[in-house]
Structure formats: C-alpha cells, structure tokens
C-alpha cells in the first residue's frame, strides 16, 4: 500500500483532538480533507495517488487476461485473499493462470494454475476457467479447451471445443485434470472431456459432426450449487463457418451461441436427461418467434456475432438469476445481461433494459470503458461484486487487448416490483469504496434518517442512500433531482455518533443535470474530550476533468463522484448544501456514500 496523506496541504485539520482551547461545548472549524484532485508530481491528472486503505480505482493493471473467475477465500491459509483465474494470452492459451490480490486492483501472479498433460484431450485453446469451492477442502475448475490431440481417445473428439474438469486442494493450485470413475460408472481418462458431446447434442436431435469447421462448440462453463444439488451452465455455440444447413434459429455465416444447462450427479457426471436450452438469441424466451418477444438488449448490442455466452447463476429469495454476456466478444458493446426464472433450469425470461436487463455495459460514445463483459459475481464479506474484463486501452477491445476491473453489485427493484441484479459501473477513473471486509469501513448512509429541501416535484429522496448510482439513462436505478436555480439541502442524521472517515457524493449520469460544486458540507462532530460542534468544508469542487466526455456532452463517466477523505471523526449528522446553478431543468445527485463504522 502507498503512504497517502489524507489532509490537503493547503488545509490544516482543526478538530481540536487533544488541543488546548477545545473545552467549549460547541465550536465550528474548517474540515481538513483530501478530495483526490491534487495533480501528481509530474503534473498529470489521471491515476493520482489515493488512500488505498479506503478506496480502489480500476486502473486496469492486470492486462492480457480475460474471462475472469474470482473467488474470495474466507478460511485457511489464504483467508481474506482474492484469487483470479482467467484466459491468459501470456500463456498462449495453453494453460490457465492464477493471480492473488488483497484489494482486487493490485494482483500478484501465482504462475500457472493448470496446464494439461500432453496426453490430454484438451491440449490447446484453454479458455474461460470457473472455480468453485466445495466447502470440504477441494477447489474444482471447469474450463473450455480445443482438442488438437489426434492421439487422445483415438481422435474421437479431435477439432472440437469441449468442457474439462480439474481439481486442487488449494486456491493457488496446482490443479490437475480430473480422471477416474464417474457416478455413471464410466471411466474418464486424460483423453476424455467430462461431457460426451454426442449425448449432449442428441437431446435436441442435432448430431454433432466431427471436423474443425462443422461443429458445435461447448465452452464458458460454470458450476452452481443450489443447496445439495449441483448444476452446470455452458454456452453451446455454432461456429460462424458451419457448413451444416442452418436451422431457423441460426443466421448463416454468423456465429451464434446460446446458454444451456444441465443438472450434475456430482462434479464429474452430468445427468444428460436434464440438458436444457435456456436462452434464444434475440428473444426474451426460448419459445420466442415474433417481434413481440424481441429482447431489446440482445438486438441493440448485436454485432457480426450473435451470442449469449459466459453464463453464471445467482440465487436470491427463491429467484434464479441467469446472467450472461451479449454482443460480440470484440465489440465495444459486449455487456452483461440477465434473465429471471423460478428454477435452476428455467424457463427463464430475459429482462428489457428498462426493467434492469442490462447489468453491466457501456453506451455510445463512451471513451472510458469498452467491452465490459464475461463476468464473475464474487461475494466479499456481506457484499457482492462483479469482476469482468474490458478493453485495456478503454476505447477498443480485442482478444489481445483485455484487462480486469470490478464494481459493486446488489439487488435493486424495477417498476414491476421485481428484484433484479444491478451493478455500480463500469467505473473507470473515479475512486470507489473498497469492500468493507477489506477496509473495515462500510457505507452507513442507508442507516441514516434523510431529509431534503428543494426537491423537484415528482422526485424521491430514496435514491440518495439506496447504495446505487445510475450508470445509464434507462434502467432501474434512479437519481434524486432538485429544482434548478434554488438552494438545496440534504441532511443525514444517525441516532448515535459514528466513526466516519470519508464521504463520496455521486454526480448525475446525465451531463445536463450535473452539479459543479457543493457550497458547504457540514459535519456534526464530537471530539475525544466530548466537545461537540461542526466541521465545515466550503466550495468543494467536482472534478470534471477526469469524469466528463466533453466531446459528446451527453453522459458523465459512470461512478463520477466528489470525494472527501479525512482522518476519522465521530459524526452524528451531515448536511450538504448546494445551489442548483441552472435557471431551468434540474440538478441530480446519484448517491451518497458515508464510509464509517
């Protein structure tokens, strides 16, 4: 961790902790803080130093890695550590790499987690690993690989892409390919993938033909434990150069990939009788045939490749959330979407963008993120996060140019009353709070009583402390709007004093509704000696330079915020006062985060 000076050099901390003259029961002093806007020593504005004990920033430091699977280890030798597994260009996709991190930003390579033996069926093109812990000391990795080995299994699977299984006693690896007798009594050797593709395709009556350019591909697998039951999800893709007569579901000359699922008898044995198709590209359901069942996210983000891929399952309060990536893998609009169901194998119904279907994605003219897809939902303590890859240069994306980022996620409610997954991002240059399990500080704003003045008619103060900020103009996350030309005030009050170390005030995603500065932020504080009073920050300016796409002037960067980072203070109230500068319209606040204990 870098040493970071929390107090801006131009402002002295004057909260009178143990300083003479603070015996008064009431006082008002200037709050000393760092807002992260001081230039670096070389004068540059981006990637400035910051307090790494409280915040993180997606600096995209882990490059040439894609398709991340991330787990947070809660016990044992690596308790409190994050492990990431991914498709690795540096390994020439002949092995799966593993990296370890304390904060999700700074990653140390632990080398090769898994490299198949030369006799293995899956000897090349190792992609998209997913790791799950069984709770009993074993870590299981599923992965995709292409069988370029003509010797393995007599060349039975040569040229095709299938799913393999590896196992380890440690999250750091090494993983070894699983071999042995599965639950059906079949002997699985190095030359066999854990699924027999002939049995998988036979379920819907379509035979899998051999040959490099005439095949179905099985990839992007993930395991999901639902109580004592285990399920496997995967993408079944039809190659863009497929010479088979395309069916009605597929566009000739284009790659199509859709989500399928199967119940597992154990980690190595699929129950082939349960293989189920879960999505249909372009439609809300697998039975969709008419325009009325079009899915706007699939169609809005379609490219030359028409895909639903990289599935993950999440369950909350009896609802199953099938999340997956849409758009082409090299498209700037590669995004994460969701469908809802009442059982692990569906049926599932995709959500529209207005109903929260877009979990994570970019918009037209964004210059700070591209291709934010192939995700991993990772619980860290009591919070949920979404890891994903994106273009390493932030403008474009291709198979040689990807990096890892992450953002907060959680449950929001759409206008139909459905609880849906939502993500705070994709964020780029702005600071975000570290996971509470890592920093020891959580967002206590939702625990405060909130009052406001200057609220625009029809707006709602609930968006101020719901834990979400809007990343798109359309979606399930709203903003609190205030009348233009007025002085607005937001007040947060706690029933008792809380230890507070930082305040983040999120701006509107809509360029036309942004605030430029905050006239006053006043904290009701208590000193160590018991004196009470206020600590005040005046004219705190919002950092427009690294949060705005000036060329389009339509959308702000997702997660743009004003940050006040200060030494811990005992606080029981915060009042935020600002003047909406415009003569018409409104000014919006996306969210308020107070990092405290």
Locate each region found by the language model.
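Bacterial N-terminal signal peptides that target proteins for export
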Residues: 1-8
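Conserved positions at the start
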Residues: 65-67, 126-128, 218-220, 308-311, ...
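Juxtadomain low-complexity/linker regions and immediately adjacent membrane-anchoring helices
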Residues: 412, 418-475, 509-522, 577-597
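Aromatic, loop-rich ligand-recognition surfaces of beta-strand-rich domains
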Residues: 472-535, 558-597
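Non-cytosolic beta-sandwich-type ligand-binding/adhesion modules
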Residues: 101, 164-170, 178, 333-343, ...
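C-terminal motif of bacterial Sec signal peptides marking the signal peptidase cleavage site
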Residues: 18-21
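Beta-rich carbohydrate-recognition and catalytic domains
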Residues: 25-126, 133-219, 224-303, 315-320, ...
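Extracellular beta-strand-rich recognition modules
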Residues: 234, 388, 574-578
């Amino acid at each position: 961790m870098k040493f970071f000076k929390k107090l801006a050099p131009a402002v002295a901390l004057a909260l009178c902790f143990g300083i003479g003259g603070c015996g008064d029961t009431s006082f008002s002093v200037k709050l000393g803080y760092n807002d992260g806007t001081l230039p670096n020593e070389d004068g540059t504005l981006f990637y400035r130093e910051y307090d790494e004990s409280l915040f993180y920033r997606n600096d995209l430091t882990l490059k040439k890695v894609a398709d991340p699977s991330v787990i947070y280890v809660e016990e044992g030798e690596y308790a409190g550590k994050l492990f990431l597994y991914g498709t690795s260009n540096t390994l020439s996709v002949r092995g799966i790499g593993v990296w370890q991190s304390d904060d999700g930003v700074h990653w140390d390579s632990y080398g090769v987690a898994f490299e198949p033996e030369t006799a293995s069926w899956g000897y090349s093109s190792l992609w998209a690993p997913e790791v799950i812990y069984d709770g009993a000391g074993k870590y299981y990795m599923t992965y995709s690989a292409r069988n370029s080995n003509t010797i393995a299994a007599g060349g039975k699977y040569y040229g095709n892409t299938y799913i393999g299984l590896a196992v380890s006693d440690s999250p750091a690896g090494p993983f070894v390919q699983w071999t042995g007798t599965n639950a059906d009594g079949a002997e699985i050797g190095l030359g066999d993938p854990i699924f027999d593709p002939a049995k998988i395709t036979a379920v819907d009556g379509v035979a899998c033909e051999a040959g490099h350019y005439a095949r179905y591909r099985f990839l992007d697998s993930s395991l999901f434990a639902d109580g004592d039951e285990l399920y496997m999800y995967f993408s079944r893709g039809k190659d863009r150069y497929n010479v088979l007569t395309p069916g009605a579901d597929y566009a000739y000359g284009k790659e199509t990939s859709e989500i399928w699922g199967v119940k597992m008898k154990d980690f190595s044995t699929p129950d082939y009788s349960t293989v189920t198709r879960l999505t249909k590209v372009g439609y809300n359901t697998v039975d969709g045939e008419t325009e009325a069942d079009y899915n706007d996210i699939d169609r809005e983000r379609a490219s030359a490749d028409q895909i639903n891929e990289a599935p993950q399952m999440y369950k909350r309060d009896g609802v199953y959330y099938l999340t997956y990536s849409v758009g082409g893998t090299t498209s700037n609009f590669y995004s994460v979407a969701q469908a809802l169901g009442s059982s692990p194998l569906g049926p599932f119904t995709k959500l529209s963008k207005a109903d929260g279907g877009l979990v994570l994605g970019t918009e037209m003219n964004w210059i700070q993120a591209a291709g934010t897809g192939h995700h991993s939902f990772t619980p860290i303590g009591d919070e949920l996060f979404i890891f994903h890859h994106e273009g390493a240069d932030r403008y474009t994306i291709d198979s040689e140019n990807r990096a890892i980022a992450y953002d907060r996620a959680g449950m929001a409610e759409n206008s139909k009353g459905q609880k849906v997954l939502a993500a705070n991002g994709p964020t780029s240059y702005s600071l975000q709070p570290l996971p509470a399990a890592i920093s020891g500080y959580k967002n206590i704003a939702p625990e405060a009583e909130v009052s406001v003045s200057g609220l625009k008619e029809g707006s709602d103060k609930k968006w101020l402390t719901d834990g979400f900020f809007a990343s798109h103009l359309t979606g399930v996350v709203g903003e609190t709007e205030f009348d233009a030309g007025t002085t607005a005030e937001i007040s947060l009050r706690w029933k008792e004093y809380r230890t507070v170390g930082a305040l983040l005030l999120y701006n509107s995603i809509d360029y036309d509704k942004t605030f430029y500065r905050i006239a006053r932020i006043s904290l009701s504080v208590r000193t160590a000696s018991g004196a009470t009073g206020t600590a005040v920050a005046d004219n705190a300016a919002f950092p427009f330079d690294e949060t705005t796409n000036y060329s389009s002037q339509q959308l702000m960067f997702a997660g743009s915020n004003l940050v006040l980072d200060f030494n811990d203070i005992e606080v029981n109230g915060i009042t935020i006062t600002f003047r909406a500068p415009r003569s018409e319209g409104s000014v919006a606040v996306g969210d308020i985060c107070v990092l405290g204990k």
